A protein has these predicted regions:
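Conserved Rossmann-fold NAD(P)-dependent oxidoreductase catalytic core, especially the SDR/UDP-sugar
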Residues: 104-145, 165, 170
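SDR active-site strand-loop-helix element
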Residues: 6, 34, 78-82, 118-124, ...
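N-terminal Rossmann NAD(P)H-binding glycine-rich loop of SDR-like oxidoreductase domains
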Residues: 3-26
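Active-site helix of classical SDR
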Residues: 149
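NAD(P)H-binding glycine-rich loop region in Rossmannoid oxidoreductase-like domains
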Residues: 59-101, 109-112, 127
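Conserved glycine-rich Rossmann-like NAD(P)H-binding loop of the short-chain dehydrogenase/reductase
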Residues: 25-41
Length: 197
């Protein structure tokens, strides 16, 4: 079985790799981490992202057609974690180019190799700015380029799934993601709170 992680060197991906190695991988299974950055390079989570035995690290840009050498199996699963996600902080076209083009290329790769399972990490951003309680039935009304790009990427994945009833798609819309090695808003808020105690 192949566990194929696009964007596997990011915060979620590195924790997922640790979990897969600990709980899921059997002899003969392979984890592929396909990302623009590799463990030990600038831009990855220090202290969390290190090279792991049993993981094949491949430098890859999801904005371009995807192809790499591997032996597909019927059980393979893709984790599509690749994204430009900090908002604000990037030109608008960066969100669309990476998040939308990336979704097109990942689903084309899955189609080419007959991979029937994708887990796509979206965001709470497609819901838009609102203080209302969010549910799976809440109408998405994104109001940022990031939110729009993630909603379109969800639709690209849903179209891929709709083409074959044997395909399985899970879309996750996390709110705030935090934990060991994360240096975003929750960590900054926590540090400010501790400084004033």
């Amino acid at each position: 079985m192949n566990y194929i992680l696009f964007g596997g060197s990011g915060f979620i991906g590195t924790h997922l790799i640790h979990l897969l190695l600990k709980e899921c991988v059997r002899p003969g299974d392979v984890i592929y981490d396909l990302d623009l950055v590799m463990p030990g390079e600038e831009g990855v989570v220090p202290g969390i992202v290190e090279k792991n035995d049993g993981v094949q690290y491949i430098r890859l840009d999801v904005r371009k057609p995807i192809d790499f050498e591997f032996v597909p199996t019927p059980e393979d699963v893709i984790f599509d974690l690749a994204a430009v996600h900090r908002t604000p902080g990037h030109p608008e076209e960066a969100y669309f180019e990476t998040n939308i083009r990336g979704a097109e290329n990942v689903t084309a790769f899955a189609e080419k190799y007959g991979i029937r399972k994708i887990l796509f990490t979206s965001s709470i951003a497609p819901y838009g700015a609102s203080e209302d309680l969010k549910t799976e039935e809440t109408l998405p009304t994104p109001n940022t380029p990031y939110g729009i790009s993630k909603l379109v990427a969800e639709k690209i994945h849903q179209i891929w799934q709709a083409r074959d009833p044997a395909r399985e798609l899970t879309i996750v819309r996390p709110g705030i993601v935090y934990g060991k090695g994360e240096h975003g808003n929750m960590t900054r808020l926590y540090k400010i709170g501790r400084a004033h105690v």
